[in-house]
Amino acid sequence: MANIKSQIKRNKTNEKARLRNQAVRSAVRTEIRKFNAAIEAGDKDAAQAQLRTASRALDKAVTKGVFHINNAANKKSNMATAFNKLG
């Protein structure tokens, strides 16, 4: 347990940020999971809609500082490749 006042404050701030980041990360993972389910089902229209929402969620997460921009770009690229393979 921290004794220094500034570190006690930082611990509170870090915990709030951790919970916020966890929620955003979970939401992004859910969108990617929905996209993968649409790909597995072979539903091109649903996959296209999910690709759009998942990409949007990733971009928002980058803006909030949860994901690095290159990490999000790689995830979007992998999803686009999977979508294009769907035919």
Swiss-Prot record:
What InterPro entries does UniProt report for this protein, alphabetically? Ribosomal_bS20, Ribosomal_bS20_sf
UniProt keyword list: Ribonucleoprotein, Ribosomal protein, RNA-binding, rRNA-binding
Example of a GO MF term:
small ribosomal subunit rRNA binding
| Pfam families to which the protein is assigned, alphabetical | Ribosomal_S20p (PF01649)
- What are the transmembrane regions? none
- GO terms for biological process? translation
> Which family is this sequence assigned to?
Belongs to the bacterial ribosomal protein bS20 family.
Query: In its UniProt entry, what is this protein called?
Result: Small ribosomal subunit protein bS20
- What is the species listed in this Swiss-Prot or TrEMBL entry? Corynebacterium glutamicum (strain ATCC 13032 / DSM 20300 / JCM 1318 / BCRC 11384 / CCUG 27702 / LMG 3730 / NBRC 12168 / NCIMB 10025 / NRRL B-2784 / 534)
Name the gene.
rpsT
